């Protein structure tokens, strides 16, 4: 799954109230460790605190790429969102 698809999932989850910023921060930490090269958004999200929901959303919106609509729909459905 690409980063943009995951970012869209987290954006929708945070704005719907079913995902909190701490979950996104933990994901960003994992991405930094596994990515061949870290990107600015990864470091920025990772350095946010759990109460900086809007800041996390802003950085998620900077993730480049194209979201895969099929994967995104499956993720959202699994979380009870559509």
Task: Set out the residue ranges of the language-model regions.
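Acidic, Ser/Pro/Thr-rich low-complexity regulatory regions
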Residues: 1-82
């Amino acid at each position: 799954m690409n980063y943009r698809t995951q970012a869209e999932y987290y954006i929708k989850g945070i704005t719907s109230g079913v995902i909190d910023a701490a979950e996104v921060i933990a994901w960003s930490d994992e991405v930094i460790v596994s990515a061949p090269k870290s990107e600015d958004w990864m470091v920025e999200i990772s350095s946010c605190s759990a109460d900086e929901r809007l800041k996390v959303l802003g950085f998620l919106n900077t993730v480049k790429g194209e979201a895969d609509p099929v994967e995104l729909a499956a993720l959202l459905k699994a979380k009870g969102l559509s």
